[in-house]
Amino acid sequence: MNSFPLNHNDASYSQDARLYKGISSEKRLIKLTTIPQVLSSLELYANDLPALTWYGSNDERLHLNYEILLSEIRKVVHWLRMHHRIVCGDRVIVISSNCPEVYVLQIALMSLGAITVPVNNNESPMVFEKIVDKVNPKKILTGRDVESNLNSVISSKDNIPTIPFAYGEPTNDHKWDDSGVNADDPAVILFTSGTTSAPKGVCLSHYNLLVNAEGLGQVHNHSVNNVHMCIMPLFHANAFGFSLIGSLYAKNHVVLCSGLPGITFWKILKDNFINIVSLSPEIIRVLTEIHIPGEDFPSLRYVVSAAAPLPKKLATDFIKKTGIKIHQGYGLSECVNFAATVPWNISEKVFEDILNKWQVPSIGASLFGCTLDVLNKDGVQAANEEEGEIVVTGHTIMLGYWGDDEETSLALKGGMLHTGDLGFFSEINGEKFFFVTGRKKEIIIRYGENISPLTIEAELYKLRKIGFFAITGFFNESSGEEIGLYILANYTSENLNFIRHIIKSCPSRYKPRVVIFGKEKIPATPTGKIKRSILAERFKDFSKKSFGSDPVFIKE
């Protein structure tokens, strides 16, 4: 057993946050409560079913049924145990793009009772070092497409093995249900930006993951042998919780792509009889532009929009051009992934209402295992259509932030998960449907990824040489939010070249898309804290612009 370390003073908040309709998380809502139990069930009932089809970036393709998948997991378990002495409770950092190796490895680690720590393969070296310091990993395992600067830092560590595939001999005597893993043991640490430049590690238990998987199965009517397409990266909460764990739990067939396959997306969708695919709004925007007129996808029920708010215009454009419905979902790493989703069996009338009646499309109703609510400005339950902060309670709520009692206490203050998102609910046929209207916090959500402005400022610190600057997120229809850099410096060719050089050396995920050479004072409190929401107003003219790899430079 590997219990999550929690300050006893915070225990009551934590326990209250995990109540679901008055039921303690110690009273289980599901039968299979650990990954080893799920694997044991698959061995009994799913051996011949298709499990994984992979499309690589270089026309690579691989297909596994559950019998072969389980065999590969066993081989990697053996490799982890015998070659690296990985045991229950060990943290293992995993860095790779989507591929069969990383898919198998994540499951193998959790089946051992080890804690997998997926990290972005394009992560900043500075942030990566902070993650390493925080989790103190037993091993760092690398796979495909690791960014060169990050790879250099990783290579400086001792004895970094690559992720194996089909390694070693099968160990058929291994019993999944004899592994000694408990429901409340940590299974994964997903890193997300906080209100400081230090990343926060969201620690989720086996039970957290599997209650969410049950909820996903109910809301999307998952049944054995359904086909789920995964494009989003497996280090992201949506892909990890929905595509990996949710599909494994439901005995689904996953079609895994190493990235967005472009125009071939539609062929993959049709050839594999995809039933459901989870996409970010930006991917939906791209697919709207490259849709093949006249194509029909009879197997596809709908697209799930995730990771960032879905603009109404994008939703209506996509539906009009493709004839494919979009069911928006909402969640955070802190509650596994989805906490609310538009259900599979919604009526046509209600679907039209929640898409068009309000200024933003609905994120749906609460998922099984958790409950959404809205607190008004006075901190009490909001009335119908009254805006406030969205909060979540239930059995999917995280164990806490790894090694950070203070941040855990703040997040679960008052016995509920405070999301930092503003929204409201509207009762439709006796059920609360929720809507997200904005952000309470300053975190930038770009293409579904949480990024701290302070992290970006730390990456660009050399700009202080030419002037005071600040980073803010601003609304953008394509990405949800974009990164804006405001700098108090003269608009000269020398300064332009210097900023270009600094931005070019910055990881792509942190690169500003608009740079304003300003003259107005950067808004701040008396203590110097940047008022980013006010600063964002200076970037409002770029809400409809799509950006390339180079930033736009503006003289104010």
Residue ranges of model-derived segments:
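AMP-binding/adenylate-forming catalytic domain of the ANL superfamily
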Residues: C506-I530, K544-E556
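AMP-binding/adenylate-forming catalytic core of the ANL superfamily
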Residues: E123, G394, L399-G400, L410, ...
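Conserved ATP/PPi-binding loop(s) of AMP-dependent carboxylate-activating enzymes
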Residues: S362-G369, V380-L410, E449-I451
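Conserved AMP-binding/adenylation subdomain of ANL enzymes
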Residues: L210-V227, A237-I276, E289-H291
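Conserved AMP-binding/adenylate-forming core of the ANL superfamily
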Residues: I30, D48, L52-V87, I93-C99, ...
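Conserved pre-ATP/AMP-binding loop-to-beta segment of ANL
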Residues: D48-P50, D173-F191, S197-A198, N221-V227
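Gly/Ser/Thr-rich phosphate-binding loop
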Residues: I274-L279, T288-K357, T371
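Conserved AMP-binding A3 loop
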Residues: H63-E67, A187-V211
